[in-house]
């Protein structure tokens, strides 16, 4: 009796709308991607984050967010704050983060939903949310 064998190669190329930044510049992943075969014959791709977005914030927005964070956390001039800086690594606790978001809302004239506010942990994420809300507002 003859046997039949086949190999299938599947390549997944994410679209630009589904891309998200895996590394925060420190070599660690910021989210986990899982491949799950489940009960179907086709795999499904899940991420640990509910929503991710592509970096689209303007440099001016990022710089302004950096200034606000440095002021709120009373960071010295020698402390380097970049788009990849995490609030917690700059010394912010959860209350500081809430106050930072409130300062950003006031400065940019926006209202950040609680769900989005909880997902903000870096300068870049804050700037992306601000840009997104300003676009909707215009």
From Swiss-Prot:
Keyword annotations from UniProtKB, A to Z: Chloroplast, Fatty acid biosynthesis, Fatty acid metabolism, Lipid biosynthesis, Lipid metabolism, Phosphopantetheine, Phosphoprotein, Plastid, Transit peptide
Post-translational modification: 4'-phosphopantetheine is transferred from CoA to a specific serine of apo-ACP by acpS. This modification is essential for activity because fatty acids are bound in thioester linkage to the sulfhydryl of the prosthetic group.
Compartments it resides in: Plastid, Chloroplast
Transit peptide extent on chain: 1-56
Cited InterPro entries: ACP (IPR003231), ACP-like_sf (IPR036736), ACP_chloroplastic (IPR044813), PKS_PP-bd (IPR020806), PP-bd_ACP (IPR009081), Ppantetheine_attach_site (IPR006162)
Pathway entry: Lipid metabolism; fatty acid biosynthesis
The organism's place on the tree of life at top rank: Eukaryota
The Carrier domain, residue ranges: 59-134
Sequence positions bearing O-(pantetheine 4'-phosphoryl)serine: 94
Cellular component GO terms held in the UniProt record: chloroplast
Molecular functions (GO terms): acyl carrier activity; phosphopantetheine binding
A Pfam entry, by short name: PP-binding
Disulfide bonds: none
Family: Belongs to the acyl carrier protein (ACP) family.
HAMAP family: Acyl_carrier
NCBIfam families in the cross-refs: acyl_carrier
Summary of the function given for this chain in its UniProt record: Carrier of the growing fatty acid chain in fatty acid biosynthesis.
Protein name: Acyl carrier protein 1, chloroplastic
Highest classification ranks of the organism: Eukaryota, Viridiplantae, Streptophyta, Embryophyta, Tracheophyta
């Amino acid at each position: 009796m003859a046997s039949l064998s086949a190999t299938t190669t599947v390549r997944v190329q994410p679209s630009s709308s589904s891309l998200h930044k895996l590394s925060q510049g420190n070599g660690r992943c910021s989210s986990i991607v899982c491949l799950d075969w489940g009960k179907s014959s086709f795999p499904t791709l899940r991420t640990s984050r509910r929503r991710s977005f592509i970096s689209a914030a303007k440099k001016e927005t990022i710089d302004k967010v950096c200034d606000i964070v440095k002021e709120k956390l009373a960071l010295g001039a020698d402390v380097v704050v970049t788009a990849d800086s995490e609030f917690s690594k700059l010394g912010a606790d959860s209350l500081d983060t809430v106050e930072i978001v409130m300062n950003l809302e006031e400065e940019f004239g926006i209202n950040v939903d609680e769900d989005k506010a909880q997902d903000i942990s870096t300068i870049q994420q804050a700037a992306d949310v601000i840009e997104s809300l300003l676009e909707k507002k215009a």
